[in-house]
């Protein structure tokens, strides 16, 4: 537990201290945000707000993770694992793709960065590399970071994917989550606050998997997850980094995370869900992100087939703004929905364990 607390504390401290330094640096360099011309009128006042704040989030996560393991040397904590590094590596590569996207937007003074093809190639490359490596690194107990079995709370043995299909599955999961968080990052603090809650839920889930691992506590309801404690540390560091960033990103935002942060955070959800064997449960925990990306897909499909729009504007948080809701009202209500979804997800996880032990 102390490793988790250290991860939160270090990540939060680094993020909350580094973010204002980035605000000053990006302001001097003119790295300002460019709003959508067709966006809500209230958003035009945000033009010029520093972007690429995701750098602070990624730095905070890495600092929390590495700092925890350095501190662990003093009290014989578990070392760095393949699962933890794979998740962080995936998030970092996606963060680099997002950084390039943000940089092009700034250089060209418009709200369009990398073209869709280049951005998709970056996401797919990161996902393929993650998927291939996740089925390797078998430990002494025969466990790999990921399982080819489709997973809800634990593997569904009746649905086993061939290696090639598993990699394709990872491409879908990574692309979906990175885009979902990216679309959600349209209001001050919405994505950061929601991510803090989702990763906090994952701290509870992965720590419970650690306490009930089949390797150390064999029996009914145990979990065959390779590195659950290290995943809990990654989740804790992410939650801490998001909270630290939220201090400056809360409305009215002093800085935005940009695609640098949103793509990286989407990678965190994708990576942890795959390595903790909870890909389906993640949809419940991250219901807000799922709803946001679904609203975009629905809007596009409906408009192309009928010429009409379902929402005033997509992602659908803008729909509520255009309906007259204040931005802060949308944010707080969406946070509440995320909290409910996370509570439901943790309850489903625990309920499955109770069922597994016959309670």
UniProtKB/Swiss-Prot annotation:
GO biological process assignments: cell division; cell wall organization; peptidoglycan biosynthetic process; regulation of cell shape
InterPro entries associated with the record: Glycosyl_transferase_4 (IPR000715), PNAcMuramoyl-5peptid_Trfase (IPR003524), PNAcMuramoyl-5peptid_Trfase_CS (IPR018480)
Annotated Pfam families: Glycos_transf_4, MraY_sig1
An example Gene Ontology molecular-function term: UDP-N-acetylmuramoyl-L-alanyl-D-glutamyl-meso-2,6-diaminopimelyl-D-alanyl-D-alanine:undecaprenyl-phosphate transferase activity
UniProt xrefs under PANTHER family: PHOSPHO-N-ACETYLMURAMOYL-PENTAPEPTIDE-TRANSFERASE, PHOSPHO-N-ACETYLMURAMOYL-PENTAPEPTIDE-TRANSFERASE HOMOLOG
Function: Catalyzes the initial step of the lipid cycle reactions in the biosynthesis of the cell wall peptidoglycan: transfers peptidoglycan precursor phospho-MurNAc-pentapeptide from UDP-MurNAc-pentapeptide onto the lipid carrier undecaprenyl phosphate, yielding undecaprenyl-pyrophosphoryl-MurNAc-pentapeptide, known as lipid I.
Protein name: Phospho-N-acetylmuramoyl-pentapeptide-transferase
Gene that encodes it: mraY
């Amino acid at each position: 537990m102390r490793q988790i607390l250290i991860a939160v504390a270090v990540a939060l401290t680094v993020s909350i201290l580094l973010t204002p330094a980035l605000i000053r640096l990006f302001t001097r360099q003119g790295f300002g945000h460019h709003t959508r011309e067709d966006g809500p009128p209230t958003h035009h006042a945000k033009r010029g707000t520093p972007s690429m704040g995701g750098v602070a989030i990624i730095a905070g996560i890495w600092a929390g993770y590495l700092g925890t393991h350095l501190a662990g040397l003093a009290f014989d904590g578990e070392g760095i694992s393949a699962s933890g590094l794979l998740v962080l590596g995936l998030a970092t590569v996606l963060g680099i793709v997002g950084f390039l996207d943000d940089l092009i937007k700034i250089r060209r003074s418009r709200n369009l960065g990398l073209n869709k093809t280049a951005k998709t190639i970056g996401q797919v490359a990161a996902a393929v590399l993650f998927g291939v490596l996740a089925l390797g690194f078998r430990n002494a107990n025969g466990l790999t970071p990921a399982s080819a079995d489709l997973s809800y709370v634990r593997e569904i043995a009746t649905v086993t994917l061939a290696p090639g299909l598993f990699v394709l599955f990872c491409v879908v999961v990574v692309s979906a989550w990175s885009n979902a968080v990216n679309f959600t990052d349209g209001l001050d603090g919405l994505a950061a606050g929601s991510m803090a809650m989702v990763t906090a839920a994952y701290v509870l889930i992965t720590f419970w998997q650690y306490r009930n691992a089949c390797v150390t506590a064999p029996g009914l309801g145990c979990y065959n997850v390779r590195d659950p404690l290290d995943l809990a540390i990654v989740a804790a560091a992410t939650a801490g980094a998001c909270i630290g960033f939220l201090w400056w990103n809360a409305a009215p935002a002093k800085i935005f995370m940009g695609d640098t942060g949103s793509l990286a955070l989407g990678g965190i959800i994708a990576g942890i869900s795959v390595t903790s064997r909870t890909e389906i449960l993640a949809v419940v925990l991250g219901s807000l992100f799922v709803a946001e990306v679904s609203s975009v897909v629905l809007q596009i499909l409906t408009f192309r087939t009928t010429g009409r729009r379902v929402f005033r504007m997509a992602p659908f948080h803008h729909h509520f703004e255009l309906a007259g809701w204040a931005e802060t009202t949308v944010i707080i209500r969406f946070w509440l929905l995320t909290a409910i979804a996370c509570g439901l997800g943790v309850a489903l996880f625990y309920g499955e364990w109770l069922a597994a032990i016959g309670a």
